[in-house]
Structure formats: C-alpha cells, structure tokens
Regions:
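Conserved N-terminal catalytic core of the sugar/cofactor nucleotidyltransferase
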Residues: 2, 6-9, 14-96, 102-112
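Conserved core of the sugar-phosphate nucleotidyltransferase
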Residues: 104-201
Length: 201
C-alpha cells in the first residue's frame, strides 16, 4: 500500500519517523527566521483541514486555498499579493512542503544570508545544491563564472546563466564533469517589490 495517497500526500506524512510530518518539519526549519504568524501555506481546498491540524499556530487567513492545483507561478503571485497588503516591504521565501533537509543549521545559515541579500538587492535568489552524483531526478542550475558572482559572507552568490530540465544520465555526467552546475532546490527568495516587478514584465 503506498505511503502517499491523493487523500494524504507525502507532505502530510511522517516519512522519516521523527514524529513530525514533512509539512511540520518545513515549518520548524524557519523557527528563528520567520515567526509562525508570518508563515503562509498555499494548498488545495481538499487539504485545508490537514494543514490546520498539522500547523495549528498558523492563522486561518494565512492558508490560501486553490480550487484545483495549478502550476507554481500563479500560487506565488497570489501569495505575494496577499502578503504585500500586510507588509509592503516583506521578504519572501518560497519553498515546497515536502523537502527533506538533513543539515538544518546550514540550511538556516544559507536562508539568512539570502534574506540579507534580497533586502538590499532588487534580485530574485534561488538556492542551488552542490551535486554529489550525476542525478537524473533533479533539474539543474547553470551559473556564470566565479568572477561574475557577488561575495556575500563566506559564500559566493552567483548569477544564473540558465535552468536545465531533469537530464538523462549522460547529460548529468557531463554537467558534473564541466562544473558550474548545481541541483535546483526549488527554493526562491525575494523582496515582495521584486516579485511584483517580475510578474508585471
């Protein structure tokens, strides 16, 4: 019997056996970064009660419901519009609810560094993960050369040259051999003003 079902997708399940679902672990990762009242969830109408049960600290007004699941862009635009009404200077972190993050302190460090960057830069920031193998299950981010990056703390924030769809094995091996390719984590950071400009273009 599958662990994840349409009635209870994997984000609502304790996949790791920690006593917390992936959704709860996602919210927990932002403790100390974002107060619970500033966490927003965009989900399908059918999962409203699951979200409320698993994240009881989130205000009902922060659970945005879609009548049916659409692609990511309209979800982000809708959430950004709602958040801007409450805080025109807000910084946004967009993440999936079903990620598994093993090194939470490092995750928090990267997110904090990213927030500091988007506070002062009119840029969209995405998180890339250093690839450890030729993985075909992830999309990739191709970055520009090192000298084109902006130093930020101990790490380098690099300009994106392009996004690559999930590759076949041969292409993934070529990415690793070439260097300058990262796994696409699907996490984005930006100021609400920046995302509004991006959607108006």
């Amino acid at each position: 019997w599958p662990m994840s079902t349409p009635e209870r997708p994997k984000q609502f399940i304790d996949v790791l056996g920690t006593g917390h679902t992936l959704l709860q672990l996602t919210a927990d990762r932002f403790e100390g970064i974002c107060p619970v009242e500033n966490i927003w969830v965009v989900t399908s109408v059918r999962y409203r009660e699951l979200v409320k049960a698993q994240l009881p600290g989130i205000p009902d007004s922060n659970i945005l419901l879609e009548p049916c699941m659409r692609n990511t862009a309209p979800c982000i635009a809708y959430a950004a519009w709602k958040i801007k009404k409450k805080d025109p200077q807000a910084n946004l972190i967009v993440t999936a609810a079903d990620h598994i993050v093993m090194d939470v302190p490092e995750f928090k460090r990267v997110i904090r560094e990213g927030i500091d960057f988007v506070k002062s830069e009119d840029r969209i920031l995405t998180i890339g993960m250093w690839p450890t193998r030729p993985e075909t299950g992830y999309g990739y981010i191709k970055v520009k050369q090192e000298e084109d990056g902006a130093k930020s703390g101990a790490k380098v924030i690099r300009e994106v040259e392009g996004f690559k769809e999930k590759p076949d094995l041969k292409t993934a091996e070529a990415y690793l051999a070439a260097g300058g390719y990262y796994w696409n984590a699907g996490i984005f950071l930006w100021n609400v003003r920046t995302v509004e400009k991006a959607y108006r273009r």
